[in-house]
Amino acid sequence: MSLHAQLSPEAIERLHKQRRNSTISSIVIAFLSITLVALVLGVFLLPSLVKEVPTIVTYESNLDNDNELVEKKVQVSTNRKPSSPSSSMSKVIVSNTSSPTSVPVPEVDVTNPSLDFGDGDDFGSGWGDGDGTGGGFGNIPATMKKRCSKEDRLARLQETGGTPECEEAVVKALRWLKKTQKSDGSWGGSNQAAMTGFALLAYLGHCETPHSEEFGDTVTRAILYLINVGLKNDGRIATSAPASNHWVYEHGIGTYALAEAYTFCSKLNINFPDLDKVTIQAGDMIIQGQGESGGWVYCFASTNSGDNSVGFWQIQALKACYHTGLWTDSKLKKSGRKALEWLEKAQGANGAIGYRGNSGQSPGLTGGGVLCFQMWDAGRSRNARSGVKYLSKNSDFNWGEENANLYYHYYNAQALINHGGVDWEVYNAKFRDELLKNQAGDGSWNQSGVKHGPVNNHMATCLATLMLEVYYRFLPGTGAGTK
């Protein structure tokens, strides 16, 4: 026998409703649980799937605070991975405070420019006619970026009369300079701004920038040293006393190097605090120091004459300033035209250009005058052609003799490769191998005892290096593309 309780219809209905509510609650709880699990997984997995975008921080210098210039000192630290100077960028940290700010630069590809060379009619067609485009070295002016890949350098060497040995000698020299750099970034026991400027130009001539694996730290410290010299002296890039004759040489050479460094750094998005400020101050000092004649003399004194040994460095510096974009073109071109007016007066009937107005005094400076004409759009002028004719007859190069003075041939090599043709081929055959075989085993050159020549091994090494870079360096101020 069994007993069964009979439920009322109302109780049965309540039971069914309770079951329905329980089912709905179970579904809702399950959905919420799945959603919660998905959110937790997303928190942990999402960061690994999203590429982090670096925050770029740059330094904004205070141009109005003049009272701190003497005490202000720029500091730098770098962190770079192995790379070639022409193929990839590394991270550079630049700051003037105790907390460095980072300027990351992406890796870029470098395009190879044209390899056409001169036809003997002043300028070769391969000297570029405008700024590059794109990132990295593509932004470098066309007349400068051809030095920025090893493949292009070797191709230019072959096209213009160089050899692979020239490239090897340059690298050996740059390594010697790296070893001899002082802890403060300078070189030399005296006239350090000039000696540092020479070295920096040699590095930049090989496209060694703060990004370079082997020489990046060396270049960075050299730039910072020159910036600090300028900050301490209101834009005067010199360690010599203002009353000395030497400081104007230092200033021209140092300004030339800083301006070219600024062009590279600005195009590569490398920010050195106060580099622009010091470059502008230094360039303005050259413009203001130009005499009524168009020339420059010791101490930038007022003059109706000109000291061409001093003036040539100012003219080269102003052309480098032109490429920075920090001035209006008209201001710099006006100064350049005035300088050429003086050189026209100083040039002799035979094409020679000497120390001052007397073309017969130190006519070895003729190459510098020709280079200045070429820099400021007068490479096809009668004056430039006359100077080239003089050089073609008076540019022997016998190491150990006075005619091999590297100070003069630094100019001759640039002037004659710009001109191109047979004149360049003949001259190149005179100096190239002589220079190569007289490099010391440590990478340096010594030309002591040569009258009016390099004052020390450092200067001789820098000038010789710049001569061997002439095949691909293409100074910012040379070539048809600099107009």
Residue locations for each model-derived region?
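Intrinsic-disorder/low-complexity signature in envelope-associated proteins
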Residues: 2, 6, 10-12, 45-161, ...
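An alpha-helical repeat/solenoid feature that recognizes helix-turn-helix modules
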Residues: 131-172, 186-218, 231-284, 288-433, ...
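Membrane-water interface at transmembrane helix exits
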Residues: 42-46, 322
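Strand-loop microenvironment adjacent to phosphate/nucleotide-handling motifs in alpha/beta enzyme folds
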Residues: 1-2, 27
